[in-house]
Every structure is written in C-alpha cells, then in structure tokens.
Regions:
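Active-site beta-alpha turn of Rossmann-fold NAD(P)-dependent dehydrogenases/reductases
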Residues: 1, 40, 148
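Conserved AMP-binding A3 loop
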Residues: 1-18
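Short catalytic-loop micro-motif centered on adjacent basic/acidic residues
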Residues: 9-10, 37-38, 62-65, 87, ...
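Conserved AMP-binding/adenylation subdomain of ANL enzymes
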Residues: 15-35, 42-85, 98-99
C-alpha cells in the first residue's frame, strides 16, 4: 500500500478469495445475472480484490473499462452495458457531482440496483447526490490493503445514513480506543 508514502508490498494468502466471495455475495449483493463495474485500476488492491476476485468467484460478469474519466462516458457505459452493481471511489463521485444531476439524467440508468464507494471517506453530500442523480444512495464501506477484504459496510438491506460507513461484517469486532488503546464507551 502506498497511501501514506512509497508503495509497500502487501501479501495476501490464497484463501483470501473466500473473503472476496463472501463479501461480494453479502456486502456487494452480487447475483448471477449482474453486470458489475468496479472502476478501480487493477494496479490497486480494490481493482484486484473487488474488480476481479469478488465478481469472478461469484460468477458475475464484469465490465472492464481502460479509458480515462469522463462523466458522460461513465454514464454512457452504465447505460450501454446495463450495469447493475457499481463500485467506485469517493474521488470519482465528487468529480461526477461537479457535472450536476443533468448529465446522469440524460442516460437510462434504470439497470443500476446498487452503488457503493470505497477507498477514502465518502462525504454525506455524495450519498445525497446519488439519490438525486439516479435514485440510489452510495453505500460506503471500509477496508484497507492490510485487511485484504471489506471489514465495515453499509449492507444492501441497510438504510444508508449519510456520513456513516456502516457496521462490521460478521466476525469483525470494531471499537474506538484512546491513546492507551483502551476502549472508549459510546457517546
């Protein structure tokens, strides 16, 4: 991971594909007839873990796009390929937001049933913009290179609270600790 400096190698075991399968199925809600688009480059962990392994292990068709960013082009791809599940980054959502709601509303995006974000905090305005632009909130989730798979998520069944990254997946315990690593009570 190179988030805070020069890239460092991250080792993941082969069994990690089981986590990608499970989170693809239960967090991303991947179904056999879906057309899935993860906009992350395969040079990043999201591009491999959730651009390739999660959809492949769930038997889902993936859209692969190698071109540059253009709001009109991205919405045209969703329309043309009838994308049903879309996984993108908050930076991309903010760039799409600059285009306003008029551009996405020129396209038939009715195939989309689920939209998610990952890679950095999603500002509440991004969630609201998704609702205004195409009738779906972005479901934020959290993980990092070192965890190898989604750890905290807004599940498909959850009502999204703008600004919330969701709840831990089964088997993950989370909490807030102080400077001595002691748990801090809610409030």
């Amino acid at each position: 991971s190179g988030t805070t400096g020069l890239p460092k190698g991250g080792s993941h075991v082969h069994g990690a594909v089981l986590a990608h399968y499970a989170t693809g199925k239960y967090v991303q809600d991947l179904q056999p007839n879906d057309i899935y688009w993860c906009t992350a480059d395969p040079g990043w962990v999201t591009g491999t873990s959730y651009g390739m392994f999660a959809p492949w292990s769930n038997g889902v068709t993936s859209l692969i796009y190698e071109g540059g960013f253009s709001a009109s082009k991205w919405f045209e791809l969703i329309q043309r390929h009838r994308v049903t599940v879309w996984y993108t980054a908050p930076t991309a959502i903010r760039l799409l937001m600059k285009a306003g709601v008029a551009i996405p509303q020129r396209f038939d995006l009715s195939s989309l049933r689920y939209a998610m974000s990952v890679g950095e905090p999603l500002n509440p305005e991004g969630v609201v913009w998704g609702l205004e632009a195409f009738g779906l909130p972005f479901h934020d989730n959290w993980w990092q290179t070192e965890t190898g798979a989604i750890m905290i998520a807004n599940y498909p069944s959850m009502e999204v609270r703008p600004g919330s990254m969701g709840r831990p997946i089964p088997g993950v315990e989370m909490g807030i600790v102080d400077e001595h690593f002691d748990p801090v009570p809610p409030g």
